[in-house]
From Swiss-Prot:
Keyword Cell cycle: yes
The organism of origin for this protein: Saccharomyces cerevisiae (strain YJM789)
Domain of life: Eukaryota
Sites of Phosphoserine modification: S152, S168, S314
Region described as Disordered: spans on this chain: 1-56, 237-256, 280-351
Biased composition (Basic and acidic residues): 1-27
Primary role: Transcriptional activator which promotes cell cycle recovery with CLN2, after pheromone induced G1 arrest, probably inhibiting the ability of STE20 to activate the pheromone response pathway. Binds the promoters of genes that function in cell cycle regulation, cytoskeletal organization, and spindle assembly. May also be involved in stress-resistance.
Record-level GO BP terms: cell division
One of the record's GO cellular component terms: nucleus
Protein name: Transcriptional activator POG1
Main location: nucleus
């Protein structure tokens, strides 16, 4: 019976709460070895730091909840971090909605003011434009101050395109699409077109003053004589007369007959230029209207072809010995073949 009041007195002397439990644990460990005592000291040093951090975070959350409008914080769990974040998001959404309402009200007021200014005669349009320009400049300045100016690739490209052409000699580039097209009517210059109209065929006429010197006669183009098919019926047209060869015909060329008179009388050279005549060649006619005959100069030189020079053979050209029937209907005299070879001491003329 004496031991029970002693136990009750010991229980009264013991403090209550978590701190008392820690003290009892500490006293119990202190009775052990030295190692257990040292570990107990480290745990007591770390726990006060953690408790201080948790107390600070709780105080901040309580303040935030009070600012959000929650007075009865005891009903909420302040230790729950997700709950506080949700309340913060709701507060941000409400603030943005209020800002939008204020902006809409300001715009409505501005519209009313502008309408009244337009209706009144005292305020002119120039003053309104000045006010609008001032507001626009203020907005642009605010945007430039708030945002960083970063050069975009679009602006750099425009600067390169609009750069001056004097920077480099290769800067001036013109394309075919940039060159304006000019018509022939504006310039007054007409370019010849192919096959516009058929041309009239004329025969060459050699010069009389060059008949004496065979080496000074100019070369004449060989013009093809065209026999019209529609002027004469078959078998009734003029026939080409063949020349007769004599013993001394080495230096003579065949003489044309007077068929040009009959052709001229029937109107060979008086055809319509704009028409397209149908013409054909005779079966046995060459470019001069005669039968092809070997040249006598070539027959004479067959025996000494191996001894003569090559240039002397290719330079002999027989010229036409007749005039145009339009100018001189009489047959012209015969002439020698023309040699256009330029003779030198190294290459003398043929003998």
């Amino acid at each position: 019976m004496k031991q029970e009041p002693h136990r009750q007195s010991e229980e009264k002397e013991k403090p209550k709460g978590p701190m008392a439990v820690e003290r009892e644990h500490h006293t119990s460990l202190s009775s052990g070895t030295t190692m257990t005592a040292s570990t107990g000291d480290e745990s007591t040093n770390s726990r006060p730091v953690e408790s201080s951090q948790t107390e600070k975070s709780l105080s901040l959350r309580i303040r935030i909840l009070k600012q959000l409008g929650f007075d009865d914080i005891q009903e909420l769990n302040a230790c729950d971090t997700g709950l506080v974040e949700q309340f913060l998001n709701v507060r941000l959404i409400n603030d943005t909605k209020e800002l939008e309402k204020i902006r809409e009200s300001n715009l409505a007021k501005l519209n009313q003011i502008i309408d009244k200014c337009m209706e009144s005669d005292k305020i002119s349009d120039s003053t309104l434009n000045k006010i609008l320009d001032m507001s626009m400049n203020r907005d642009t300045n605010n945007d430039n101050n708030n945002h960083l100016t970063i050069p975009s690739p679009i602006t750099t490209k425009k600067r390169k395109i609009n750069a001056s052409e004097l920077a480099s000699p290769r800067g001036h580039r013109r394309y075919r699409s940039d060159i304006p097209t000019v018509s022939e009517v504006e310039t007054g210059v007409g370019y010849p077109q192919i096959h516009q109209q058929p041309g009239a065929y004329t025969l060459p006429m050699p010069a009389n003053q060059w008949m004496s010197n065979p080496y000074m006669q100019p070369p004449q183009p060989q013009v093809q004589q065209i026999m019209p098919q529609y002027l004469y019926p078959p078998g009734m047209g003029p026939q080409a007369q063949l020349p007769t060869m004599s013993s001394n015909s080495e230096s003579q060329t065949p003489v044309m007959s007077s068929q040009f008179l009959s052709l001229n009388q029937h109107g060979l050279y008086q055809q319509n230029i704009g028409a397209h005549p149908v013409m054909s060649m005779g079966p046995q006619a060459n470019i001069y209207g005669q039968q092809h005959q070997p040249q006598p100069g070539q027959e004479r030189d067959q025996s000494r072809k191996s001894f003569s020079h090559r240039r002397s053979q290719s330079a002999n050209i027989s010229m036409a010995n007749f005039r145009s029937p339009m100018r001189n209907p009489q047959p012209a005299s015969s002439q020698r073949p023309v040699n256009f070879l330029i003779h030198t001491p190294k290459h003398p003329p043929p003998t």
